[in-house]
Each structure stands twice: as structure tokens, then as C-alpha cells.
């Protein structure tokens, strides 16, 4: 979906790819309807930067022909559908609708490479469609928001007279999954492991992680990892091995 925290790095990704590689076309950006508008906006915002760099480094190093982003849009799938949105060799990516209302379109992705698979929830409340579309994945990457901690933040905002933060911390409760709901989804999907990402709120001290994870082990039989920046997940093809390494 197109919330700012999910797209704000696109410009830098495209620029680093362009200036640091040997490409003959812009970076193709796949997404639901609306992605062309996002791509156009980033290209407009970065156009002057491109001109500066090409003038400085030359056409061979920073050619305009490979600069920026291009869009490949697909329609929001109906529940029960998971169209292929990217395919290359043994790699196949399908998209499915999730529940992040009032934000629409919002999708998750299932990524299959040979005999291994992962699914990425995107932002969503607990979703029956997600569970259906992710059956049997090796690893489910699922967002989670601790409603216990966010409600405490909401109470603190009210006490401090911060009406804006009080409103926001109330509004966000109903369009994200709780940690236990993420674990339930992994269990119902038959996933082998659950990696929780998009962790809300951040967990800067270890006692908060205990509060965040409360009840998850009762809801899911497999391995649970609360991810941090730098968490690395590897699934060797031709095996059932799942290697998860966090800093």
C-alpha cells in the first residue's frame, strides 16, 4: 500500500541502483493500481538530482536512459485470488488482498522459489484471505502492533493533553494485527516459522519485548522471531532448513 513509511525509500533505492550499477532501463516497480502515480512523483522529485549527477559524472556512468523508476501496475485481487505479478525462472511472486481499511489498495505477497516459499503480509488486520493465500509457507512475515502498549501510549497522550497523538494511537488499533493475531494467522496458515516485522511500537528495551510477545507461544507451534533491522532469513533450496539470524 502507499502509506509513506512503506514507500519513502524508493527514491534512494532507485538512485543507488542507477549510480552504482550497469543498467539499461529504469527500475521496474510493481504494485497495485496507483503505483504509477507514486513512481511519477518520485521521478519528478529526483529529476534535478539526476541532471546534476549526469552533468558531473557523464553519460557513461550515469546515463539518463537507466535512471529513475518505471511502473507495472496490477488490479487489486478479489478475495480468494492470487494473480502472478512477477515471474522469472524459478521465481514466482503472487499478490493477494489484505485488510488495511480505510487504506486501499493494500496487498500482501507470496514469493515462491523452487520448493521454498515465504509470504509477506503488508499492513493488515487479521485477515482470513491472507490465511487462505499463505497456506503451507515456510516463513510468514507478518506485521504486528501491540495493542496493550499502544493503549498505554494513548492514555499517556490523553494525560499530557496531546489530543492529536491520542487520536492517532486510538485510530491505529483497528487496522493492524496484534502479535497474538499474527501468531494465530501463522498457525492457521500452517507456516513453519513466523517473522514479525513492522513492529509497533519499537521495542528499545528487552522488558517491552516480553510484553509484546505475551501469548504468542500459545498461539503458534513454530519458531517466532521478532525482527530488527538486519534480521536475515535464509531458506536453502532442496531442504526444509530455515536459518534466521538477527544482530
Where on the chain are the PLM-derived regions?
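Cap/insert and terminal regions of metallo-dependent hydrolase folds
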Residues: 107-108, 114-119, 125-229
Amino acid at each position: 500500500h502507499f502509506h509513506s513509511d512503506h514507500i519513502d525509500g524508493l527514491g534512494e533505492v532507485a538512485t543507488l541502483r542507477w549510480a552504482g550499477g550497469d543498467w539499461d532501463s529504469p527500475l521496474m516497480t510493481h504494485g497495485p493500481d496507483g503505483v504509477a502515480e507514486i513512481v511519477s512523483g518520485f521521478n519528478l522529485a529526483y529529476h534535478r538530482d539526476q541532471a546534476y549527477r549526469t552533468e558531473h559524472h557523464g553519460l557513461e556512468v550515469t546515463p539518463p536512459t537507466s535512471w529513475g523508476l518505471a511502473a507495472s501496475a496490477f488490479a487489486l485481487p478479489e478475495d480468494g485470488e492470487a494473480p502472478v505479478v512477477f515471474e522469472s525462472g524459478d521465481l514466482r511472486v503472487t499478490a493477494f488482498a489484505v485488510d488495511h481499511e480505510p487504506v486501499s489498495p493494500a496487498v500482501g505477497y507470496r514469493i515462491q522459489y523452487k520448493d521454498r516459499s515465504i509470504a509477506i503480509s503488508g499492513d493488515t488486520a487479521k485477515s482470513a484471505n491472507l490465511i487462505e493465500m499463505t497456506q503451507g509457507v515456510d516463513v510468514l512475515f507478518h506485521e504486528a502492533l501491540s495493542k496493550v502498549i499502544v493503549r498505554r501510549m494513548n492514555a499517556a497522550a490523553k494525560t499530557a493533553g496531546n489530543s492529536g497523538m491520542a487520536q492517532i494511537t486510538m485510530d491505529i488499533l483497528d487496522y493492524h494485527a496484534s502479535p497474538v493475531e499474527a501468531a494465530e494467522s501463522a498457525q492457521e496458515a500452517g507456516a513453519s516459522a513466523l517473522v514479525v516485522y513492522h513492529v509497533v511500537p519499537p521495542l528499545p528495551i528487552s522488558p517491552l519485548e516480553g510484553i509484546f510477545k505475551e501469548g504468542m507461544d500459545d498461539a503458534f507451534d513454530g519458531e517466532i522471531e521478532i525482527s530488527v533491522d538486519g534480521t536475515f532469513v535464509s531458506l536453502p533450496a532442496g531442504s526444509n532448513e530455515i536459518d534466521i539470524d538477527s544482530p
